[in-house]
Amino acid sequence: MGDKAGVPYDGNDPRYQDLYHGKADSADYGWLTKNPVWQKEWLASITELIDMYKPDLLYSDCGLPFGNEIGRSMIAHYYNQDMLKNNGQLEAIYNCKEASLGRFVRDVERGALDSISEYPWQTDTSIGDWFYSTGQKYLSADQVIQMLVDIVSKNGNLLLNVVQTPEGDLEPDVLQILEGIGTWTKDNGEAIYGSRPWKKYGEGPSTTTKQVSGNHGGIKDVRPYVAEDIRFTTKNDTVYAFCMNTPVSDLNITSLSQVSRISTKSIASVSMLGSKEKIKWKQNEDALLIVKPSILPNYKVVVFKIVFKK
């Protein structure tokens, strides 16, 4: 069918099976083949890739390939080779789409987790479609930032696809999104980079309403937020409180109240990242009160740096 009908293709030629693969069994219609010959060929190919190119990261767009015997053999070889390269320190990262229990980094496509994970994990998603198409709609910079913050607050990492034209260029809308993310990161990056999840990931309506399921597991990664929705990260003696939408009034963060069992330390200072304005605040019995700043940035997610007394 089509303009390629009748054109010879060497992938269909049995003489070239070593370059491609053998003829598929009509009953073998799963995402991963059951053919043991091809499984061993795959393992040999990935082993060669690891040995020759020593990748920092490997990603499988599926669960653990071909079950425990093949998949775990590949991971063990990958990790062992990486430790030889790094004087006994494991720095390699392997992603695949199933729960890992720390054996590798779980990937959730177009979704997120609904709570803090003991083990690092990853969301992979796109600002639009996976590939370019004329007239497609993109996420806004604010939506990407909200998604990033929610993921990081739960011990996750965001792998973001940025759509390019067939020529490898970026459309003006895409450039604007990246510039918006860059502006926010310049002001608030310290609350993301090198941070860890706090004792809870957040508070507000988004933590109590029923979660919408994601496309490939987990919960939906892009969702609406209000100013009362808060996310947390921590670093040293500091907690960062992300207000997930533009504050319209004073903030009351109940997780940081005087009597909160979550935080037993007294607060020394509160500031807003990216601003020199002196923030008015008070740690009350029922909540940490933060008076709405007189000047707010152009982006939606505002970050407050809360330093505890030592």
PLM region spans:
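Mature catalytic domains of secreted/periplasmic carbohydrate-active enzymes
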Residues: M1-K310
